[in-house]
Amino acid sequence: GLTFAAEAGTQRLRDVINKNVTWEQIERGCRIAFSEGYTSVKLYFMMGLPTETMEDIKGIADTAQQVVDLFYQIPDRPKGKGVQVTISVACFVPKPDTPFQFCAQDRREALQEKQKYLLSCVHSRKIKVNYHDSATSVLEGVFAKGDRRLGKVIETAFENGAFFDTWEEYFNYDRWMDAFAACGIDPDFYNYRTIALDEVTPWAHLDVGVSHAHLVREYQKALQAQTTPPCNRQCSACGANKLIGGPCFDYHQDLL
């Protein structure tokens, strides 16, 4: 099947994350796919996005149901076959050097509650829901925005038997929590709090080209659900052009 990355269940939340995709575009893509013989599609979403509400979670199920309904509205759809729509939901992890680096990550309990609510919103057997383990996402959030003190935590967890942890059968969340406790480190400090806009972060000394001021601007726009056009349409003064010594694009030409 084909995968469509809608990212969020409502247009409001897609605007927050600057995902310039509309339902009309998703519908058009699915319509073409079904007309060409496809009977299964995957819709990719994220859960735990900044400003997210339960209405946005319900929107994930609603979008999938709209795709199911669309299949049966197409006259030249594959005959004799049903449609299968798979919802794949990842847990959002705020990352350094992005506008959402300032955001707190959803707590594990909140993510689990949203996962259960999403399942309750799906009423069709033609819709399947897959979601990422919230525990691994929480750890990813800690190490994504962590500092060098976490090196000891990793070493301690390894000494206690943590390895191949990306494999579900090897992963043990409690082992990691024990390692944090043994090192006297509170993991909540790293991923469950909002970072002040002027805070010196563990990665502030690294220059990736994009300026801190740009990240702040984009973060503030995101909270207002204001989108930013693509770079080839309008320069947002992110600062990356300093790495190449000139303009990033020829703005007199449209890029495909």
Which positions does each model-derived feature cover?
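Structured core elements
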Residues: 1-5, 40-44, 86-89, 130, ...
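Generic recognition of flexible, low-complexity loop/linker segments
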Residues: 29-32, 72-77, 118, 140-142, ...
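Short, well-ordered coil/turn segments that N-cap beta-strands
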Residues: 37-39, 81-85, 125-127
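Flexible helix-coil linker/hinge segments at domain or subdomain boundaries
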Residues: 72-78, 117-133
